[in-house]
């Protein structure tokens, strides 16, 4: 067993998990805005009680065969496995328990969607049920793996919640069976102004519909941050370009 101490010699508590031949150590670090913090890892003294933060807590809660709940101190998220593992509810506890999952019937939060022009139609991950596996569930981190399909192509999505962090991490991998065509149509007229790859609505996308009134959008551009005044960013030809290039992030 291990213990973690801060620079004052205080035992701050930790959690150790075994991963095969390796171990993973979790602890909550405090770092100043400008500077660094030093921590010491020692073997736990014999007979010493564990700090309260070292307990396994917040185990994932199975709602029913179609839904699964993942929860930490920041969020409570309900995944709908019958619809490709999309997010049915996303409650932000620090924002007055507001549910940020869009209550629309058109799209789902976290849905994969694109126009497969060889089939002549849109395909979506909600067409196929998904499988959910709990990868990690402790006081510091909740991590799940969702396995589903879009148009028979399998995908894996790993979603991570970290204690005290507003960010939700998504890691998506699609295992393409072949070189499938996704877009408005197969481009053949390269001298035309209109191009098949311009309109984002037909591209492979991850959808994040939100239930916001009078939203404002800020975009991270090189050396600047811009507030968008556009109703949308859809265009079909290169001479009608709208600003849809993001450097790192979008704030909504």
Summary of predicted features, one role per range:
Residues 1-22, 33, 214-252:
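Trp/Gly-enriched beta-strand surface patches
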Residues 1-180, 185:
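Catalytic and substrate-binding regions of extracellular carbohydrate-active enzymes
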Residues 14, 25, 87, 132, ...:
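Generic hydrophobic, helix-prone segments enriched in Leu/Val/Ile
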Residues 57, 89, 108-111, 131, ...:
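Acidic/proline-rich low-complexity IDRs
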Residues 64-66, 77, 130-134, 145-146, ...:
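Intrinsically disordered, low-complexity boundary segments flanking structured domains
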Residues 94-119, 198-200, 209-232:
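Acidic glycine/proline-rich low-complexity segments
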Residues 164-223:
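Acidic (Asp/Glu-rich), glycine- and aromatic
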């Amino acid at each position: 067993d291990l213990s973690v101490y801060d620079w004052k010699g205080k035992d701050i508590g930790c959690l150790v998990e075994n991963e095969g031949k390796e171990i993973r150590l979790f602890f909550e670090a405090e770092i100043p805005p400008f500077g660094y913090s030093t921590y010491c890892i020692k073997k736990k003294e014999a007979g010493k009680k564990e700090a309260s933060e070292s307990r396994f807590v917040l185990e994932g809660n199975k709602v029913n065969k179609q839904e699964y709940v993942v929860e930490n101190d920041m969020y409570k998220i309900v995944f709908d496995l019958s619809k490709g593992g999309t997010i049915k509810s996303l409650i932000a506890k620090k924002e007055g328990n507001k549910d940020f999952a869009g209550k629309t019937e058109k799209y789902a939060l976290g849905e994969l969607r694109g126009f497969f022009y060889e089939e002549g139609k849109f395909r979506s991950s909600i067409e196929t049920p998904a499988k959910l596996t709990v990868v990690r569930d402790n006081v510091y981190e909740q991590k799940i793996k969702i396995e589903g399909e879009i148009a028979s192509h399998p995908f894996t999505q790993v979603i991570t919640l970290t204690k005290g962090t507003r960010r939700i991490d998504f890691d998506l991998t699609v295992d393409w069976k072949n070189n499938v065509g996704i877009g408005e149509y197969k481009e053949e007229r390269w001298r035309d102004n209109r191009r098949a790859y311009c309109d984002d609505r037909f591209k492979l996308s991850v959808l994040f519909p939100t239930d916001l009134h009078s939203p404002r959008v800020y975009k991270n551009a090189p050396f600047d941050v811009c507030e968008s005044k556009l109703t949308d960013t859809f265009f079909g030809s290169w001479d009608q370009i709208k600003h849809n290039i993001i450097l790192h992030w979008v704030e909504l």
